Each structure stands twice: as structure tokens, then as C-alpha cells.
Regions:
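Bacterial N-terminal signal peptides that target proteins for export
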Residues: 1-8
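Short, surface-exposed binding/anchoring microloops in extracellular/periplasmic proteins
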Residues: 24-61
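The feature marks short-to-medium sequence segments in extracytoplasmic or secretory-pathway proteins
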Residues: 56-82
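Residues lining hydrophobic/aromatic ligand-binding pockets adjacent to catalytic sites
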Residues: 62-67, 88-90, 117
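Short, solvent-exposed, Trp/other aromatic-anchored flexible loops in extracytoplasmic proteins
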Residues: 72-102, 108-113
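Short beta-strand elements
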Residues: 116-126
Length: 126
């Protein structure tokens, strides 16, 4: 599956083409990164997944370096979102070292693990 990507740098909004979630894969629909008022960056991530209940749902997403070697933060999702698709959750004040200009967001589900598709977003002011 190919996901079309367009990056709008002015608002640091990453929009990904809406495609139906493949069974088991979490689709990252949108990522917004903004400078936090208390330092670091705030992230809003919208996910689409065919949650079926407590044994199969999108259970977290994380912010890492583009090469995947540095971990910056994680948003744990504590319950399924069967009737709320896509859904958006936030992670605030993520500290990212100076010099890092963009990060990768990847999503996970309880049954299949990490989704193949990731999203890369530019950090505002970097």
C-alpha cells in the first residue's frame, strides 16, 4: 500500500492520504508538531485502525529519531476506540535534542505490533 504524503512546513502539519486501514496495520492519518510553551514540542497524532476490542486495538504511538535509534516519547492508549475512528491523541512537552530537525512517528497495535507505515514531521523553528 502506498501512502501519499504532503508536508506543510508553515504549520508543521503532516497530512497522509486517507486509506483504509489494512487489518492489523495502524494508519497514521495526521501529525501536528508545535513548539511547547514550557519547552520541547507538543504532538497531536490522528490514527485509523480497525479496533475490534480489548485484544486487538491501536495501543500506542511514539516519537523517535528518523533513523529509529533515539526514543523521545510515547503516548500509551489504554483502551480500544471501536466507535471513534479516526481518533486523535496528544503528547506534550517532548524534549528533543538541539540539531534534530525532524522526527518519525510510528504506531503500534496489540495484535500485530508496529505498523509498516510511519510518518516524518519537521519540527517548527528548527
Amino acid at each position: 500500500m502506498r501512502v501519499k504524503r504532503a508536508l506543510i512546513l508553515a504549520g508543521t502539519v503532516l497530512m497522509l492520504g486517507q486509506s483504509a486501514a489494512i487489518a492489523g496495520d495502524v494508519t497514521i492519518v495526521e501529525v501536528k508538531a508545535t513548539s511547547s510553551s514550557v519547552g520541547g514540542f507538543d504532538f497531536e497524532v490522528s490514527l485509523l485502525h480497525d479496533d475490534t476490542g480489548w485484544t486487538h486495538y491501536a495501543d500506542r504511538w511514539e516519537v523517535v529519531s528518523v533513523d529509529g535509534k533515539q526514543y523521545f516519547g510515547e503516548r500509551v492508549l489504554f483502551h480500544p476506540h471501536v466507535n471513534e475512528q479516526p481518533f486523535t491523541r496528544s503528547l506534550r512537552s517532548v524534549v528533543i535534542p538541539e540539531g534534530v530537525k525532524e522526527v518519525m512517528v510510528r504506531a503500534h497495535d496489540k495484535e500485530h505490533g508496529w505498523a509498516k507505515e510511519t510518518a516524518t514531521v519537521a519540527l517548527p523553528g528548527r
